[in-house]
Amino acid sequence: MAFLKLTEQNVQGKTVLIRADMNVPFKDGKISDDTRIRASLASVKYCLDNGASVIVMTHLGRPTEGEFHPEDDVAPVAAHLGGLLGKDVKVLNDWRENKPALNAGDVVMLQNVRINKGEKKNDLELGKAYASLCDVFVNDAFGTAHRAQASTEAVAQAAPVACAGVLMAGELDALGKALKQPARPMVAIVAGSKVSTKLTILESLADKVDQLIVGGGIANTFLLAEGKAIGKSLAEHDLVEESKKIMAKMAAKGGSVPLPTDVVVAKAFAADAEAVVKDIADVAEDEMILDIGPKSAAALADLLKAADTVVWNGPVGVFEFDQFAGGTKALTEAIAQSKAFSIAGGGDTLAAIAKFGVTDQIGYISTGGGAFLEFLEGKELPAVAALEKRGE
């Protein structure tokens, strides 16, 4: 992927506009998790350390375009960013009428981009208005890279220079390494409740990987495709044929979709449900599969330890309940111990990594939910395509 990087730009004496993803959650009016703000600090600090002034823009929540309500205000985000930087970060509400006059070292924030008319429709005039504020535009919002919007795509077309921020460049380099020229053997884990939501990812990865591990409700549908009885487990009967095709595709190239031979079942989906380990052939009609069994977990762990590239999206069991967390824990630890380059993404996956305390042992943890999935599907990400075009 050919794109310019912020860290290769001379920003001395320039105004840099950074599109960040600081869409943080709030609880009782306070920021409850500042991970996204902290993730954006590297680009802001690079600019400040190299003599630039910085304008940050982000979206927050899902406001109605053209309307402004108190809950849409980015002021708490600006205040938090200021606290982390040790600076006063002012919010600019009327930046179109009053273009800011900034000095090196200044940091300001534009009001929530999603209240601007034309933002979601990728309005070119709005993109030009953003671009008119800066000498250099930086996209550091990988989490929104799959959306063509004025603050991610149109602005990149119109700005004097458009480049990828530290976070964005890191994401793209890691994803490129994992998917464009992977070291082999390559293993992917795709898990979740439904095949339907991950079907295009499964099909796309089946072309690339040597082993395709499936988990959760997805694995149940594949077990059905193998003719196994799964009791009252969550599955999609209408996607059994698609599952058979994916298994045939993997087998034809000497790979496989290794399915569990033993499972952990319960009579109910509940935190206090009794967990029973069973051979896959012994699952009763009134039982549901909520995790893979210890034999299956050990076999899959061996596959992961022997891999050179691992792409991971989704836990293989209901890991929120400890009695059904064994499979996900075993695979998480195997990935952490493996010599493979590993990349993980998706909210549940990140929660599992945090729960089992291996955050520092995963090669790369992607910050983009939808963008990560669309990259796995092989789709073009509009905001990235815009950067690549400007990098030519």
Swiss-Prot record:
For ATP, which residues are the binding ones?
Answer: 198, 320, 346-349
Q: Name one GO cellular component term.
A: cytosol
Compartmental location:
Cytoplasm
Query: What Gene3D superfamilies does the record point to?
Result: Phosphoglycerate kinase, N-terminal domain
Q: Report the coiled-coil segments.
A: none
* Enzyme Commission number: 2.7.2.3
GO molecular function terms noted in the UniProt entry: ADP binding; ATP binding; phosphoglycerate kinase activity
Asked if Nucleotide-binding is a keyword of the record, the answer is yes
Return the Pfam families for the record: PGK
Per the record, the pathway is: Carbohydrate degradation; glycolysis; pyruvate from D-glyceraldehyde 3-phosphate: step 2/5
On assembly, the entry states: Monomer.
Q: What PANTHER family does the database record attribute to this sequence? A: PHOSPHOGLYCERATE KINASE, PHOSPHOGLYCERATE KINASE 1, CHLOROPLASTIC-RELATED
- The enzyme class is transferase
Binding of substrate occurs at 21-23, 36, 59-62, 114, 147
Tell me which UniProt keywords the record has, alphabetically.
ATP-binding, Cytoplasm, Glycolysis, Kinase, Nucleotide-binding, Transferase
Write the protein's name: Phosphoglycerate kinase
